[in-house]
């Protein structure tokens, strides 16, 4: 991937300002292809790069063509498509009988609409100003896509946990989607406009603060950093008692969310004493024997994408049941399956999720990814491995019936910080923390010094993005109202009652 200055129409002079910043390229390697920042003009293994001070100065120069104040405010582009039409078009290719459920979940609130309408925001973001620095982005960075999960050492950590929309694009896209979600979650929780603005500014402040701490770190130290929620404490945003209580309760719940607990709650023994996953239509439904065989065949391909030692481990399990299981809001209608495997004795259960990976919502508005990443399951896996500080060792991908999938553990101490619990100090604490976590993800795959230099030490960017998030929150409320009252959407939702 050649250096992309994502501010559409950047001049040659502006582009020249980035000469000291490393390119974002994808290097094709036989044993695991990775995204990495480097300068393709030189051999980086033998040539030293620019100092972080010089790279930070380069970032500051970018303000000349993309002032930080330019990120403020929101006005719909005159050519903006009808958001309802975009959402309905995104139903194409999904499981038909699940589309009404998707529509119902999206109609629940403006925040739910934002979650499910990534295609709408992708179009909107593509018309916003950007600095010109691309990184591997999450692509769907909202408050409910941060969560708890376990490391291989069974330590519960907090990080980004959904990567279906990951791609290469402007770092601002992740930051703006996160701030819009904070604004809308605040509305759901009854926060005033002043309180929402404070929380959004905390997101950006956390992002800037984290970049400032990370941009001079040794590379290995940066990549080894992960966040233990009980130890979340920031210089500007101390851990208050209410936030500590929320963390404690959430972590306790996550620790109880493991394969052993799921085996007892989500499965039962049949008349022959064999484990079977409980059915709960339309969320969990039975599938045909033919489809089960296809899924098992896909698992064989998936295993080949794991590290060799993990391949050895997972082959000690055998499949005993497979069902279709609906997940999420925007993902409803994509094919997703829950697979129960049994290992060392019939109490040793392992639950895997095989989920269809569709094209990233931002894909139409960004340069095409290299051929090696045309497989959307592979794209999701590599994005997660790069952005997540401590990943799932059983994360892999496969193809089934011509469709790309990725596979991951269903329950490995997974949990959430429920957004509905947050108000006052906890809302601001987690807003700051999520901004900081996003910055760390971007620092792993981009040039933190250049981005930090652009963002700066003042609140200029914070104020601008706060203006944007509030205005975009208003826009999303309007879009949600149009969606919830649309006759076609209402007709689809009504099918759930018949």
Report the location of each language-model feature:
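Short Lys/Arg-rich cationic patches that frequently serve as NLS/NoLS or arginine-rich RNA/DNA-binding motifs
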Residues: 1-11, 54-55, 60-63
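Acidic, low-complexity intrinsically disordered tails
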Residues: 8-43, 498
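Intrinsically disordered, low-complexity regulatory segments in nuclear proteins
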Residues: 16-21, 74-81
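Intrinsically disordered, low-complexity Ser/Thr/Pro/Gly-rich regulatory segments
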Residues: 36, 69-70
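Charged, compositionally biased N-terminal leader segments and the immediate start
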Residues: 40-52
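Conserved ATP-binding subdomain of kinase catalytic cores across diverse folds
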Residues: 50, 55-68, 78-99, 104-138, ...
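Long, low-complexity segments enriched in small/aliphatic residues
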Residues: 227-297
């Amino acid at each position: 991937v050649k250096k992309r200055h994502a501010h559409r129409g950047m001049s040659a002079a502006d582009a020249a300002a980035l000469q000291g910043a490393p390119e974002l390229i994808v290097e094709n390697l036989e044993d695991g292809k990775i995204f990495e920042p480097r300068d393709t003009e030189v051999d980086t293994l033998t040539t030293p790069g620019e100092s972080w001070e010089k790279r930070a100065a380069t970032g500051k120069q970018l303000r000349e063509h993309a002032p930080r104040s330019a990120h403020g405010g929101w006005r719909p582009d005159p050519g903006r498509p009808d958001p309802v039409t975009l959402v309905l078009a995104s139903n194409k290719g999904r499981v038909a009988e699940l589309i009404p459920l998707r529509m119902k979940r999206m109609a629940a609130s403006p925040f739910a609409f934002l979650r499910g309408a990534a295609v709408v925001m992708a179009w909107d973001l593509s018309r916003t100003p950007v600095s010109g620095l691309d990184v591997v982005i999450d692509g769907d960075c909202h408050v409910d896509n941060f969560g708890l999960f376990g490391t291989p050492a069974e330590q519960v950590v907090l990080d980004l946990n959904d990567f279906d929309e990951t791609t290469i694009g402007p770092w601002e896209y992740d930051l703006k989607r996160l701030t819009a979600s904070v604004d809308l979650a605040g509305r759901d929780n009854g926060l005033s406009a002043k309180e929402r603005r404070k929380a959004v500014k905390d997101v950006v402040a956390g992002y800037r603060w984290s970049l400032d701490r990370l941009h001079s770190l040794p590379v290995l130290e940066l990549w080894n950093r992960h966040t233990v929620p009980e130890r979340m404490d920031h210089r500007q945003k101390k851990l208050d008692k209410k936030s500590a209580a929320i963390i404690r309760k959430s972590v306790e719940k996550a620790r109880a969310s493991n394969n052993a607990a799921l085996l007892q709650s989500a499965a039962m023994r049949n008349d022959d004493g064999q484990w079977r996953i409980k059915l709960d239509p339309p969320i969990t439904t039975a599938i045909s024997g033919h489809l089960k065989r296809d899924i098992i065949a896909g698992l064989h391909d998936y295993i080949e994408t794991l590290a060799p030692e993990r391949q050895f481990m997972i082959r000690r399990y055998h499949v005993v049941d497979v069902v279709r299981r609906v997940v999420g809001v925007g993902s409803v209608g994509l094919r997703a399956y829950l697979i129960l495997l049994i290992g060392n004795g019939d109490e040793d259960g392992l639950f895997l999720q095989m989920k269809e990976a569709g094209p990233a919502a931002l894909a139409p508005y960004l340069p095409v990814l290299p051929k090696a990443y045309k497989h959307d399951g592979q794209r999701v896996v590599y994005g997660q491995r790069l952005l997540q500080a401590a990943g799932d060792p059983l994360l892999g991908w496969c193809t089934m019936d011509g469709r790309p999938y990725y596979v991951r553990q269903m329950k490995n101490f997974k949990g959430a910080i429920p957004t509905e619990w947050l108000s006052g100090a906890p809302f601001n604490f987690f807003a700051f923390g999520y901004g900081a976590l996003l910055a760390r993800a971007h620092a792993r795959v981009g040039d933190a010094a250049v981005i930090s230099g652009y963002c700066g030490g003042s609140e200029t960017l914070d104020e601008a993005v706060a203006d944007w998030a509030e205005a975009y929150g208003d826009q999303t409320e309007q879009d949600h109202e149009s969606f919830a009252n649309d006759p076609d959407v209402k007709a689809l939702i009504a099918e759930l009652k018949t």
